[in-house]
Design a protein with these regions (language model features):
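Catalytic-core "active-site belt" of small-molecule-metabolizing enzymes
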Residues: 3-177
Length: 177
């Protein structure tokens, strides 16, 4: 039995859109962040059939939080099967975004174990622009698609000052961008 209040058919439709890189279908009005968080594990299972591969923070920009009426960032789930390796070659997907991130591995109690560079590929396209709400962002898992973790360093040995020296290279059609 589900512990959420959203229609199963809605989760099926969203999962299909995510898996096929299509626009998210029109969503019912008034989906709360709380309802979306309750439904999110059920969506992840529909998308991948496997367990989450980790957590992701989203809407970390305070201006966007204010626009969406939030006081803190949102959390989503990374798909375990979506972990990719350096040098990944992907087909073009209209609207896909590339986000440079920091990956942090946590132990079971949530304490940081290691940290390193990460790249997240995000694909989120609402068919109805007005559907861009905090609850709907959570419900659609904030566009989680693929992610790449770089070399991880033990948390207590990481020099956070080196972050200004990180270089990322994107190659598109054989050209460095």
């Amino acid at each position: 039995m589900s512990n959420h209040r959203l229609p199963e058919s809605l989760l099926d439709d969203i999962a299909l859109a995510i898996k096929t890189h299509r626009s998210i279908p029109p969503l019912p009005k008034g989906i709360s962040v709380e309802d979306a968080y309750a439904a999110l594990p059920h969506l992840v299972k529909r998308v991948t059939g496997d367990r989450p591969g980790g957590l992701k923070a989203g809407v970390t920009n305070t201006d966007i939080q204010a626009f969406l009426g939030l006081e803190e960032a949102l959390l989503g789930m990374l798909y375990e099967s979506s972990a990719a390796s350096d040098g990944l070659v992907l087909p073009f997907v209209k609207g896909r975004k590339i986000e440079c991130e920091m990956g942090i591995r946590l132990n079971a109690d949530g304490s940081p174990l290691s940290v390193g560079p990460a790249v997240e590929l995000v694909n989120l396209d609402f068919s109805v622009p007005e559907d861009l709400t905090a609850g709907n962002l959570v419900l659609c898992n904030m566009g989680t698609d693929r992610f790449i973790l770089g070399n991880m360093t033990p948390w207590d040995q990481f020099d956070f000052g080196l972050l200004t020296e990180v270089e990322i290279t994107v190659i598109h059609d054989g050209k460095t961008r």
